[in-house]
Amino acid sequence: MTKTVQKSKARDMTQGSIWKQLLLFSLPLMAGNLFQQLYNTDDSIVVGNFVGKEALAAVGSVGPIINSLIGFFMGLSTGAGVIISQYYGAKADEKVSRTVSTTLVMTFILSIVFTILGILITPYMLRMMSTPNDVIRESATYLKIYFGGVAGLMFYNMGSGVLRAVGDSRHPLYFLIFSAVVNTVLDLLFVVSFGMGIEGVALATVIAQYLSAVLTLYVLTTTDGPYRICWKKLCMDWSLLYRIVCVGLPAAIQQMVTSVSNVFVQSYINVFGSDVMAGWSAYMKIDQFMMLPMMSVGLASTTFTGQNVGASYIDRAKKGATTAFLLAELVTIVMMIPLLIFAPQMVYLFNQEAAVIRYGTLFLYLLSPFYILCCVNQVYSNVLRGAGDTRTPMIVMLGSFVVFRQIYLFVMSHIFDSIIPIALGYPAGWLVCSVLIYACYRKFRWNKGMRKN
């Protein structure tokens, strides 16, 4: 039974129609990422409507902190996924198995480190972000509970990354749907029925994340594929760990430092008070949904490129990059239309106060047209990662999202006493990053990358 299920889920992306392979692989990723976002979005909707705007601002303001720490681990997981996809494309089953084992041990160790570190640095990070006094206590409460259960998030993302690397994007989707439903039910139960406030939404998120982790690990344990987890044979292959770190560390540094830079962006937002913070929080939740199509296609292009590079199908990998970009642009444009039409109504879902709706709508109208720039960055940076080059995206993104954006924000904050120039810091960084990453993709030497990997 397990064998039949596993064969129907894994996908060999070295054969068949390119656009169909990318589309069929991307759709479950889009749906899965959608339900992933429902975790924090449910939290925001519930606290915004049943607790208050301060609680909504608290949930929104801690996002960059969570992403900065989790982003480091996710970067290392990217390294593991690239290596697994290349070995899978090359039909090197023993290497696939040992890479999965090494990744699991690495995840266990890092989950302990991140749990302790996250709880310890919470108050310092919140003060560094200039979090207002009417928000800081609830922000700290939410963060500490979240980090107490961060292992569930890590093991789910590790497991789903392994499944994506071999072409299975459906199992992670099924588990996310289940856990998102559980999260929603528990949010309402803990907050509305039990009156637990922000502690309730944080606890609901942690429970749901652990459920998705358990289900993912179960699939990896029971499959008959080369990526099966054999608990009695778990070991750390130091040579493979070195490869994972070499490929994943640049992505890890990039994601973590970029997220840290977003902490500083949040600090500029916080200066304008809780109304602007709540409006920005609502915008950021909607922004995460808008990013889903391009992020999903980008992830698909990583797996597609990795498998085809592993099989030495370079021309097919290049065609896949162009197809993925066009697909991401098309879906993003289609999603932008209803967003611009119903912007006030979308913000209303998070909070009904007039000032919050006004600021949230302003951010949506101001920034949404620039989403078409992000498709360039999301697709071509992931293509380079799939080919084994994670350093170039790291350098480009750090230069664009950290150095350039922080200089821009510093200058604008001293010239203008307005939130609009601050908000435009995001698309300004997108533009610089997209131009640079596409130029690097055009100059990428595929044959050299193959020999290196």
Listing of model-derived features with the role each one plays in the protein:
Residues 1-26, 84-151, 193-249, 305-370, ...:
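Short alpha-helical transmembrane segments in multi-pass integral membrane proteins
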Residues 15, 19-38, 42, 65-72, ...:
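Residue-level signal for short hydrophobic patches within transmembrane helices
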Residues 77, 146-164, 172-180, 201-216, ...:
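Short runs within selected transmembrane alpha-helices of multi-pass transporters and secretion channels
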Residues 53-64, 143, 202, 274-289, ...:
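Small-residue hotspots at the loop-to-helix junctions and early N-terminal turns
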Residues 41-44, 116, 158-162, 184-189, ...:
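Alpha-helical transmembrane segments of multipass membrane proteins
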